[in-house]
Amino acid sequence: MKMTSIQQRAELHRQIWQIANDVRGSVDGWDFKQYVLGALFYRFISENFSSYIEAGDDSICYAKLDDSVITDDIKDDAIKTKGYFIYPSQLFCNVAAKANTNDRLNADLNSIFVAIESSAYGYPSEADIKGLFADFDTTSNRLGNTVKDKNARLAAVLKGVEGLKLGDFHEHQIDLFGDAYEFLISNYAANAGKSGGEFFTPQHVSKLIAQLAMHGQTHVNKIYDPAAGSGSLLLQAKKQFDDHIIEEGFFGQEINHTTYNLARMNMFLHNINYDKFDIKLGNTLTEPHFRDEKPFDAIVSNPPYSVKWIGSDDPTLINDERFAPAGVLAPKSKADFAFVLHALNYLSAKGRAAIVCFPGIFYRGGAEQKIRQYLVDNNYVETVISLAPNLFFGTTIAVNILVLSKHKTDTKVQFIDASELFKKETNNNILTDAHIEKIMQVFASKEDVAHLAKSVAFETVVANDYNLSVSSYVEAKDTREIIDIAELNAELKTTVSKIDQLRKDIDAIVAEIEGCEVQK
């Protein structure tokens, strides 16, 4: 019997995770992730490139061609289209086939990765390809102490990835690569705890954030994530909406070098061409990219919670166009609102930003209160949503989503209490599609729903010292048991009567015992 796509996916996931654990040996999975993910990426770009060269002609098998038949024109055209070049001898399938007997495997892999990256030098794709394999260190002692040990471990990784049934490019099953990559990242993140949560937003939460940012837009110029992580949030927008809706592609900035490379690989693995994405490395708050690319019609982000930043120690930042309008900087110990103000500055007049936030920023005083006042007074806050606890990797905190808009049609602020909308899984809670649909329905309608949603007048928020905590406006359902006092009194009367009767019975027994003792 033929397996369904769901069964195929489940089997593929089981197989991938087993391979990932088998090949790492005693090395921690978190430390070894770049080899498994890197090998999967290497296989993807090899097959993707072969498919491009063959162009549907069954008489051509690029992997079997000799490198010498490649002309400069073929190479030039390919790099302009795909962004990189891979010779037949450098393809994953050819390297993996000889991996177990290749005494120079680690050196050969390094040379191939250098060649792929250098093929883009001088082309528009150079920045998108440069350093992609930097974390696939073929000389690392994580692979083993000797060259022989390193080669054996590398061969195991290549053979494992080679064995994955990811379909054929001619069968249009490209998404299986992206799905496999996302599954691996998700599992690595789940097992890494806090450090994993910093680079991956679970798909179910990403889906909600993407829908919030894209709601009501028939098309957006481009989508942006100022704390891109592994790119999972940006890619949810691609999965949720047709390609033509996002016209100019995907933009993001990431501070961690390894995660930055994972994000770029993730884009390729989801079949986003180099000219449709731009992921930059650097500190978004102090070294922001894409000033010339803004404004963005859709912004999604799950920035790190309450991280330290330079803040007021850098006197130039208060005059930065991103922060100056608020008249105050986010506290040095809590950069949350710095990310919010950055996103607001990059947002277009027709766009929305959906940002995951630590709940404390919505009620604390000081600079954070002043920033809330700026946001509310200028009517930028569309909705604040409180989520259930334990939805994210590495933290059990119940976080909020802040939705910013520059095109509101009224001055109310909507509050949604989604803290009871979750399904309990083994280690984490999840949002089901039904939960997301329910949140989106009340978000779109702006209707008041008891214990779930309330749209609050601007004056009320002002009178409440610009407190934006959902619990201040949406009354939680009283889950305490309702007690019938009359019924309780009746039960109490019956119980007292029984106690009185028992006392009389006990007194009678005692009197009888004492009478017997007197007779003796």
Task: List the predicted regions and their residue ranges.
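A structure-centric signal for secondary-structure junctions around beta-strands
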Residues: V36, F177, V220, E247, ...
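Glycine-rich, flexible loop segments associated with nucleotide phosphate handling
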Residues: L176, I223, S333
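Conserved S-adenosyl-L-methionine
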Residues: S195-S301, S306-K308, D313-L317, R322-G327, ...
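Generic marker of residues within folded, mature protein domains
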Residues: H170, D242-D243, L269, F392, ...
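Non-catalytic, mostly N-terminal accessory regions of nucleic-acid modification and defense proteins
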Residues: M1-L208, L212-A213, Q217, D275-T284, ...
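A conserved structural/catalytic subdomain of Rossmann-like adenosyl-cofactor enzymes
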Residues: K2, Q7, E287, E293-K520
